[in-house]
UniProtKB/Swiss-Prot annotation:
Record protein name field: Catalase
Domain of life: Bacteria
Chain segments annotated as coiled-coil in the UniProt record: none
Annotated spans, Disordered: 391-413
Active site (catalytic residues): 81, 153
Function according to Swiss-Prot or TrEMBL: Decomposes hydrogen peroxide into water and oxygen; serves to protect cells from the toxic effects of hydrogen peroxide.
Cellular compartment(s): Periplasm
Gene: katB
Record-level GO BP terms: hydrogen peroxide catabolic process; response to hydrogen peroxide
Single GO term (MF): heme binding
UniProt xrefs under PROSITE patterns: CATALASE_1, CATALASE_2, CATALASE_3
CC annotations in GO: cytoplasm; periplasmic space
Database matches in SUPFAM superfamilies: Heme-dependent catalase-like
Entry-linked Pfam families: Catalase (PF00199), Catalase-rel (PF06628)
Length: 513
């Protein structure tokens, strides 16, 4: 017999198998597999059948439960911000702004756990992260006062200023409902009626619309919020995250190269960096206006399509992301961010888009994760929750009180007077009308001129190419908007789009700014 075959003798095989099993049992202690009711599973490899050739039995509860749970693994996809990734971290307040806000999260030296969810806005779950899209930058602060959600984007402005246009805007951005294909002409048909979108469209079709990574991306509140101090004094603020990794974007050539290698490049970059201990950081800045300053601008400062040029920024803290999620679905997918999650000292402004988001985001999260979704671990506040809201599907609480109402002497729950909303003076009548100070084009021109020559050329090529396949009337209206913002910008776009420049000039001359 060949000596080399000795290792395959049956006796030696049994010894080897026994030794392997012993080594495994020493290194990994196996847990008992159970069903959802906690009962142990006897066989998870074979269905129970009526004999060797008979049908599968209905009494095989392990098989039935596995299939039932598999059929129900997914929750509704977010209608926007579906494709995302998340991480845990900490925010440390570095400045005393008690003159502006009584929120404990801003007390100098205060350390607050955070969860951040980065996302693409328009495109669906599992879409390539190289696609041109604004990026969500949403932060949940688990503060001593309750949870505060700062739900923003990488762009400092938005496409619209009134929430009543939000469903239409999203529909225009989404694929054609007939073919499920993306179609720029649908978007420009809509935006030809929305001149206030020109600045954010410029951002979208610039290289800022294709960031290289989430780590190398800034974030913005987009909206103004009110900060309220202990004396009830109000200041309007905008929040800005500044990446300490710098900013890096992809040009059109790089987009094609990256997408060919990795359609999850932004998620991979963030997860890999944190796994290696290269923790990304952002400084948080605020811009501040007094209420009386709002009337001093030639545009409406509470218009979400505008930035606040010339208003100094003040650093108030730093955030570090230092832990990846343990389970993507339970944390990143089930996290429920909403601008309505505010704490005393932070209130919404009168921004018309923000006012709609206060309802829409909380409502869509209730639709996605249920009425008790804020009780999920990733959404649960660190502070005590003491509410009379009750029942509903998947209520995992344990209430022992017989008093499910307020006020009550039997089981009193006191209100906190300092948490009342600040009083806001009002005048005028109810109305449905545009804001008075629109100024739709000036900031677009300033943005275009702030870009270097290469970035301008990339922008003109990307946006001009999209306009070239748009219907004629929408194309000329859009070109007139960009020409009104900056003549060089409009001229370059008209050339790429194959348009008559004289006609563009004539339309632009009729526009007011």
């Amino acid at each position: 017999m060949n000596p080399s075959l000795n290792a395959f003798r049956p006796g030696r095989l049994l010894v080897a198998a026994s030794l392997t099993a012993s080594l495994l049992s020493l290194s990994v202690q196996a847990a008992t597999l159970t069903r959802d009711n906690g009962a142990p599973v006897g066989d998870n490899q074979n269905s129970q059948t009526a004999g060797p050739n008979g049908s599968v039995l209905l009494q095989d509860v392990q098989l039935l439960q596995k299939l039932q749970r598999f059929d129900r693994e997914r929750i509704p996809e977010r209608v926007v911000h579906a494709r995302g990734t998340g991480a845990h971290g900490e925010f440390v307040a570095s400045a005393d702004i008690s003159d502006l806000s009584m929120a404990k999260v801003f007390r100098k030296g205060e350390k607050t756990p955070v969860f951040v969810r980065f996302s693409a806005v328009v495109h669906g779950n599992h879409s390539p992260e190289t696609l041109r899209d604004p990026r969500g930058f949403a932060t949940k602060f688990y503060t001593a006062d309750g949870n505060w959600d700062l739900v923003g984007n990488n762009f400092p402005t938005f496409f619209i200023r009134d929430a009543i246009k939000f469903p239409d805007m999203v529909h225009a951005f989404k694929p054609d409902p007939r073919s499920n294909l993306d179609d720029d002409s649908r978007r420009f048909d809509f935006f030809s009626h929305v001149p206030e979108a020109t600045r954010t469209l410029t951002l979208l079709y610039s290289n800022e619309g294709t960031p290289a990574s989430y780590r190398e991306m800034d974030g913005n509140s987009v909206h103004a919020y009110k900060l309220v101090n202990a004396r009830g004094e109000v200041h309007y603020v905008k929040f800005h995250w500044k990446s300490l990794q710098g900013q890096k974007n992809l040009d059109p050539k790089q987009v094609a190269e990256v997408q060919g290698r990795d359609y999850s490049h932004m998620t991979n970059d963030l997860v890999s960096a944190i796994r290696k201990g290269d923790f990304p950081k952002w400084d948080l800045y605020i811009q501040v206006l007094k209420p009386e300053d709002l009337a001093k601008f030639d545009f409406d400062p509470l218009d979400a399509t505008k930035i606040w040029p010339g208003i100094p920024e003040r650093k108030i803290g730093q955030m570090v992301l230092n832990r990846n999620v343990d389970n993507f679905f339970q944390e990143t997918e089930q996290v429920a961010m909403a601008p309505s999650n505010l704490v005393p000292g932070i209130e919404p402004s009168e921004d018309r888009l923000l006012q709609g988001r206060l309802f829409a985001y909380a409502d869509t999260q209730m639709y996605r994760v249920g009425a008790n979704g804020l009780g999920l671990p990733v959404n649960r506040p660190r502070s005590e929750v003491n509410t009379v809201n009750q029942d509903g599907a998947l209520n995992a609480g344990h209430s022992t009180s017989g008093v499910n109402y307020q006020p009550s002497r039997l089981d009193p729950r006191e209100e906190q007077a300092s948490a009342r909303y600040v009083r806001t003076p009002l005048s005028g009548t109810t109305q449905q009308a545009k804001i008075q100070r629109e100024q739709n084009f000036k900031q677009t021109g300033e943005l275009f001129r702030s870009y270097g020559k290469k970035d301008q050329a990339d922008l003109i090529a990307s946006l001009g190419g999209a306009l070239a396949i748009t219907d004629d009337e929408s194309k000329y209206i859009m070109l007139s908007y960009f020409y009104k913002a900056d003549s060089d910008y409009g001229t370059g776009l008209a050339k790429v789009a194959g348009a008559d420049l004289q006609r563009v000039r004539q339309l632009a001359a009729k526009l007011q700014d």
